[in-house]
């Protein structure tokens, strides 16, 4: 694997690690009755995006990235701890959880932007980066609306 491919694969792996925690948080927040189904679609979208990135990492590295499954497993542990702490229950916890999710989504959006610019090697999937960038913008807007509502409730 050449240096450019190594760099792209490492960058994408880093995003996958963050995405695994983000996916678990998204499942918790989407499962909160307070959201009234507004982001029920988010976990499935995140899973699909992660599969797309993982596939490209495997193409670049030339081997199966089996360790990524373990990272997602760790994310499940994070979900368990977060569930015990009830990160989506309580006015301020909900605000903080939504802020964390939105931050992760904006980091992911930056990855898609770099892919669109050709700085990160998505190969034949480069064209899909624009679609995923638009999807990330929509997801962030949805979370912003929930965050605003949560903040109104928390600080009123």
Where are these regions (language model features)?
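Carboxylate-rich helix-loop segments that flank metal/cofactor sites and access channels
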Residues: 59-91
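Structural signal for well-ordered, non-membrane alpha-helices
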Residues: 20-23, 27, 47, 51-54, ...
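Actinobacteria-biased recognition of intrinsically disordered, low-complexity terminal regions
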Residues: 1-4, 156
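Preference for long, well-ordered alpha-helical segments
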Residues: 104-156
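Hydrophobic stripe of amphipathic alpha-helices that form coiled-coil interfaces
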Residues: 26, 33, 53, 60, ...
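Alpha-helical scaffold segments that form or flank carboxylate-/histidine-based iron centers
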Residues: 7-15, 33-55, 97-100, 125-136
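Alpha-helical bundle segments that constitute or directly flank the non-heme di-iron/ferroxidase center
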Residues: 3-33, 94-119
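Short, flexible helix-adjacent loops and helix caps
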Residues: 28-34, 58, 62, 86, ...
């Amino acid at each position: 694997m050449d240096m450019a491919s190594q760099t792209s694969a490492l960058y994408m792996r880093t995003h996958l690690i963050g995405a695994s925690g983000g996916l678990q948080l998204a499942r918790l927040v989407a499962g909160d009755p307070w959201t009234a189904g507004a982001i029920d679609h988010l976990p499935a979208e995140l899973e699909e995006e992660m599969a797309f990135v993982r596939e490209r990492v495997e193409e670049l590295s030339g081997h199966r990235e089996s360790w990524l499954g373990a990272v997602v497993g760790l994310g499940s542990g994070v979900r368990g701890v977060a569930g015990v702490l009830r990160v989506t229950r309580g006015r301020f916890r909900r605000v903080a959880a939504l802020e964390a999710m939105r931050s992760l989504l904006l980091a992911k959006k930056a990855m898609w932007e770099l892919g669109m610019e050709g700085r990160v090697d998505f190969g034949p999937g480069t064209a899909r980066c624009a679609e995923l960038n638009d999807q990330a913008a929509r997801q962030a807007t949805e979370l912003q609306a929930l965050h605003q509502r949560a903040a109104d409730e928390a600080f009123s």
